[in-house]
Design a protein with these regions (language model features):
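Glycine-rich phosphate-binding loop
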Residues: 105
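Conserved short alpha-helix immediately C-terminal to the canonical SAM/SAH-binding motif I
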Residues: 110, 134-137
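Conserved active-site tyrosine of GNAT-family acetyltransferases
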Residues: 138, 143
Length: 170
């Protein structure tokens, strides 16, 4: 997996943001599973949560050959967040924060880093299909809804999402 030129290490307080390393894939998958189980249980049934996990797991491995770029958030040597996006189109694929680190600014910092990287490349917008449990988080970060809840197929299971976007300022 190549590390892009924009993989500058960002470290403030005790949080470090950087591009993912291949040896972290198992830890990232574990973080994604925990975040889905904790954060999505009010909006999605177990089958839907498993389908979402499988979709993100496949996407993480596809990053090695596909267009997506991944960022991890590390605090005190522990992986506490993960984000994945397409640096060409601005499609946001994922932002996951470990349960104990939720509500501590990790997700906001990951989004800010994605926006920084997109702006460096001339990106004008960040968009994606957001899970129902995360709509308020994205709205607070300046995203607007493009649709009401709609269902997407995720690993063969129908999962409701809301399409959202944020226009980036230069």
């Amino acid at each position: 997996m190549s590390i892009p030129a924009t993989s500058t290490l960002i470290r403030t307080s005790s949080l470090e943001l950087r591009s993912i390393r291949f040896e972290e894939v198992a830890a990232i998958l574990d973080l994604i599973r925990r975040a889905i189980e904790r954060g999505c249980s009010q909006h999605y049934d177990p089958g839907q949560r498993n389908a979402v996990f499988l979709t993100y797991a496949r996407g993480l491995f596809a990053e090695a050959v596909g267009p997506f770029e991944g960022i991890v958030a590390v605090r005190e040597d522990a992986l506490v967040g993960f984000a994945q996006f397409d640096p060409i189109t601005g499609r946001l694929r994922a932002v996951f924060v470990d349960g104990d680190a939720q509500q501590s600014g990790v997700g906001s910092r990951l989004l800010a880093e994605i926006e920084r990287r997109l702006r460096l490349r001339g990106g004008k917008r960040l968009y994606g299909a957001m899970s129902l449990n995360a709509v308020q988080f994205y709205a607070r970060a300046g995203f607007r809804s493009l649709s009401g809840p709609e269902c997407l197929a995720s690993a063969g299971v129908s999962v409701p999402v809301v399409r959202m976007e944020k226009l980036l300022r230069s």
